[in-house]
C-alpha cells in the first residue's frame, strides 16, 4: 500500500525512494509485524482471559502436565494473522498475484481454524470441526485461490463460439533439490493441481499436529519463514540485470522476491508471538494460527517451486505427521503402539524429557534442516 501511495511521490520527497527496493520493504514488514505483535499481545491475552476463551483441547489420554494448561488463553493465532496481514498490505506490491495468493490462503485457513477453535471453546471439548469437513474446506480454499488468482483466463472464439482457455500462472514443472532445472524438471501437467493441493493441505495439518507444546510449532515456523524469504528472493530478484535464479540454476519466478515481504511479516509476527508463547505459555495459537501458518508455508513452497525441498525444510512437521500415521497403522493392524503416544513429542514427554528440552531440540533440528534446504541452492 505504501509502495503504491508514497513511492510515486519520491520525486518530491527523496526519502520515499527507498520503497522501490524490496529489501527495504522486507525489513520494514518484519519490524512492523514484530511491533504489532509485541504491543497488542498483552491486550489480546487479557481480553481472551476475560472472555474465558481458554484452551480446552485436553484429551483424556494426554500427559498429566498438560491438564494444568486448561484455561490458558487460546486463539493467539488471530493476533499473528493481524500482524502479518497489516504488514503485508503496508509494504508489499499489491499488484503482485503471488503475494495475494499466499496471503489469501493463509487467511482462508485462518477462518477454518477460527471456526474449529470456536466450536472447541463454545462446546468445551476437544472435538471441534469434523475432520472431513475441515479437509474439504482446505481443498476448496486452495482451488478458489488457484482459479481466482493463479489462472490466466483467456477468451477465444472458434467457429463463432466463444470459450475460455486456461493458462496457469504457476509453473507446472517439478523441481528437485540438488538437481539443476535444465537437467531434470518434468512437467506434471494437470496432475500439478492435485499435487499442489496435497502440499498445502499436508503442510497445514502437519503444523497443526506439531502445535502441542509451548513454542514447539512457532519455532520451526519462524525458521521456515526466514528460509523461504531467502528462497523467494533468489528466485525472483535481478541485480543489475543479472538473474540470481539463472546463476543458481533454479526456476526463475518473476515477482517472487515480493514474497519476501510476506515471509518477513510471518517472521516478525512469529517472534512476537513466541515472546508470549514460550514455556510456560501465556497464550496458545490455536487452530486459527497453526492451520493458517501451515497453509501459508505450503503456498510458499508451491509459489517458489520448492515443493519437494519443503519436505526437508519441514522435516520436524513431517516427523510429527509420520509418527501419527505409523501409530494409527500399527495399532489397527497389530493392536500394538510404536510410540508411547503420538505425535512424537508426546512420546518424549512420557519418556521423562522436560518440555523445554523437547522444544529446543526440535528447534535445533529445524535449523539444521533449513541449512540443508539452503545448501540445495548451490549444490546442484
UniProtKB/Swiss-Prot annotation:
Membrane-spanning intervals of the chain: 26-46, 75-95, 98-118, 135-155, 160-180, 183-203, 222-242, 259-279, 283-303, 311-331, 357-377
InterPro entries attached to this UniProt entry: Glycosyl_transferase_4, PNAcMuramoyl-5peptid_Trfase, PNAcMuramoyl-5peptid_Trfase_CS
One Gene Ontology molecular-function label: metal ion binding
Record carries keyword Magnesium: yes
EC number: 2.7.8.13
Functional note: Catalyzes the initial step of the lipid cycle reactions in the biosynthesis of the cell wall peptidoglycan: transfers peptidoglycan precursor phospho-MurNAc-pentapeptide from UDP-MurNAc-pentapeptide onto the lipid carrier undecaprenyl phosphate, yielding undecaprenyl-pyrophosphoryl-MurNAc-pentapeptide, known as lipid I.
Protein name in the entry: Phospho-N-acetylmuramoyl-pentapeptide-transferase
